[in-house]
Amino acid sequence: MDTETGGLDPAQNPITSFAAVVLDFNTLKEVDRWETYVKPYNDLQITKESIQKTMVNMAEVNRGMELNAFIDAFMRFCTQNFADTKGKDQRRLVAVGHNVMFDVGMLEAAFYYSAYGKKQSLFNYIQDQTLDTMYLSKMMYGLTGDEKMTLGATCERAGIILTDAHGAMNDV
């Protein structure tokens, strides 16, 4: 999963877009995908720097989902894709992404700012343990921390062509 945001601080900057892909862990085949823009909410600011870095189309963002509709759709997406096939328990999504705790923090703040406030938790839908491709890359390539750890640099090391970075679905 990936979020694009109006800045780096969940208390001051909103999510502007979100994307997720569901994979079958046995076959690694895509099961579902979802991408959406999210309208700015709670008077949070979208910085000029984030607009330049992500090249976000503000017209698309302003036509995006309202925050409460986004949270409702996120919960539905998780539930329909991760419900136990026997109907006993709802399993929770394993959040996978590059520097994924940033995305988790942004989603957690969005839940808080929504009409659900503290009544509904992001962690009812995703596990509190994540799989971070940035850390996997460090381990796989024996990196010490001084190297560039962006998604683009990681893809280059792995021989993956990353086009249009900072588009939520492209980064997934």
Predicted regions span which residues?
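Substrate-recognition/cap helix-loop segment adjacent to the acidic, metal-dependent catalytic center
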Residues: 103-129
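Short alpha-helix plus adjacent loop in nuclease-associated cores
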Residues: 128-146
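Conserved non-catalytic scaffold segment of RNase H-like nuclease domains
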Residues: 1-108, 152-161, 166
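Acidic donor-binding loop at a coil-to-helix junction in glycosyltransferase catalytic cores
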Residues: 170
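A generic structural signal for secondary-structure junctions
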Residues: 111-116, 141-142, 156-159
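Juxtamembrane/interfacial segments flanking transmembrane helices
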Residues: 147-151
